[in-house]
Amino acid sequence: MASSYSNLHPVDQILTNLVIEAVPSDDQLIADKVFEPIVVPERSGTILLEETRNFMGAGAGLDLERAPGSSRATIGGFDRTSQTFKAKIYAASDSIAMEDIFDSQYPGSEEQRLARKVARVMKLAKEKRAADLLFDDTSFNTSAASATFDATTAEPLSELHQLKDTVFEAAHGINPDTLIFGRKTFRALARNPEVRGYVGTHAQGFASGNLILSDEAVIEVLRSVLGIPNIYVGAARQDTAVPGATSSEGYIWSGDKLFMGILRGADAIVQKSGNVKGMPVAALNFQFGNMVAGQYDSLDKTRRYVYAEEVSQYKAIDSTLGHVLTGTHS
């Protein structure tokens, strides 16, 4: 941060540790898990992307057999591409009257309470940005489910098996490595007859017949049948009402969608210039600054402010490497 900013809003290491520290429901947040993080030295730059078609047989249509003394066949090629990125600044603050700090009868520091409160706002907003990107009908290939997964006649395993083939073919023969569900769709899987009828073992024991499966058992079934290693459930909820209005909560990750695609394997290399080289993936997380926190007093010394701030960007990279399935829950 610039020195002038630090003088006005000094970073407090204790409060920074508090905003990073997890609260009990933070395990529902998946934004930091689903993307490959790319730590960049500058807020903006260029990512240079390899063209995967260059490795799909750029010599197609050529006769590679060479007669003695003749020239070798020259294969074709596809230009590599580039995109620009710019990490954005995200920040939030809250304040408390000095008198309330002095008069507080609650256990613990009021500043620490504000730090946790502000951090939760920041983390939920980050989760929302991730969900808005990966569940966006316009950022990736999209199709509608043949039936909602909570329908009695639905066959979600068969649907997901076919979706994997669709992603595989669109990605030039690369298998999807990530599957993300909204919680409603995922919970419907545990009650679905096709999934409940699956016979197999999992970490918690043996599952078969008409037993309703635990979340861990459903994930194990999906990994076993689909061969997709990274499976996540977006279960976080957020109050969507403005301050002063009646509380209205909703899921951050839409309950009637899922994402399947390639979010691993960028093998990104960050150059001194700030540019990034890598293989294409569906989306990346460009991280310029980790979340930090601090506190400062108003000029008239009547209020104390606590803030949190981070600099990052979730960015779609290749629309063909991800697929959004809609209509998965009624």
Tell me the role of every PLM-derived stretch.
Residues 1-34, 290-330:
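Protruding loop/beta-arch "assembly-hinge" segments enriched in small, turn-prone residues
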Residues 2-29, 49-50, 141-142, 148-163, ...:
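Intrinsically disordered, low-complexity linear regions
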Residues 25-93:
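Assembly/oligomerization interface modules of large self-assembling protein complexes
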Residues 98-205, 330:
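Alpha-helical scaffold segments that mediate packing/assembly in large oligomeric complexes
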Residues 104-108, 259, 286:
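Short, surface-exposed loop/turn segments at secondary-structure junctions
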Residues 169-173, 178, 222-223, 250, ...:
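A general structural signal for short secondary-structure junctions and capping/turn motifs
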Residues 174-280:
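Extended oligomerization regions of viral-like shell subunits
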Residues 264-307:
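C-terminal structured domain segments
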